[in-house]
Amino acid sequence: MPGTVLLLAASPVGKGCLVDAASVLPVLAAVPPAVLAGTDTANVVELADPLEPQAVLTRLRAAAAAPGPLTVFVTGQLQLDRKQRLPHLALARTTPSTVRYTGFPWHWFREELRLRSAGTTTLLLDLHVDAATWAWLRGRGLECGPGVAVYGRVAPPVGRRKVAAPTYMKAVDDRVAERRAAGAGAVASAGAGPDRGRGRGGGPGAVGWRCGRRWWPRCGFRPRGPFPPCPRGPRHQPSGSS
């Protein structure tokens, strides 16, 4: 059965940018789709610096509804909206004062992926955060949905007016290249990505690990720290509801 791959790289334009997210897309897009998906054939959807959260939701919803394995690569930065203090993936037009309206609410990932069969969905995340979001994540968490295998890292701020590189995703590409050279196959089925802690994709202060049966069962994605239950966010509007 064909697989589906969603490549999403987003970061704000201007001084609010924390990571050069879009720079990783040419690297990942050069990998054969079947290798990214871990299937014989695959369809790839690429979103580079999208402007509208609804456009991202439409693509994510279509990918989640597709049969077969789904692999989602997300590179970018998280910010909290000022009213509800919930994490959003910052898009091209996101500013600190407009996060709630121009960012992509993280809980939409969870809501769109929650109905997929366990073991058919993989997320690879390379996320950067500001100081406020880092503190929020340490006390809560970043849920991605039940039955979703999560690999990646959350990196703290790199300093004022500095733009970080998506080193985790570049490490994923290196791992894929190694496996292709060894004839081992695909990223989605191989447990790709650096090991837990400050591995090849980490960096100073970065927190990254592999989620799944071998590492952290269905945990979502969290930095180190106490893990009280994550409060529920605003209700997500499912497809077809009014």
Which sequence ranges carry the predicted segments?
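Short beta-strand segments
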Residues: 8-9, 72-77, 124-126
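A short, glycine/acidic-enriched catalytic loop
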Residues: 77-110
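Proline/glycine-rich low-complexity loops and linkers
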Residues: 112-135
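Active-site-proximal C-terminal subdomain of hydrolase catalytic domains
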Residues: 128-215
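Extended non-globular C-terminal regions
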Residues: 205-242
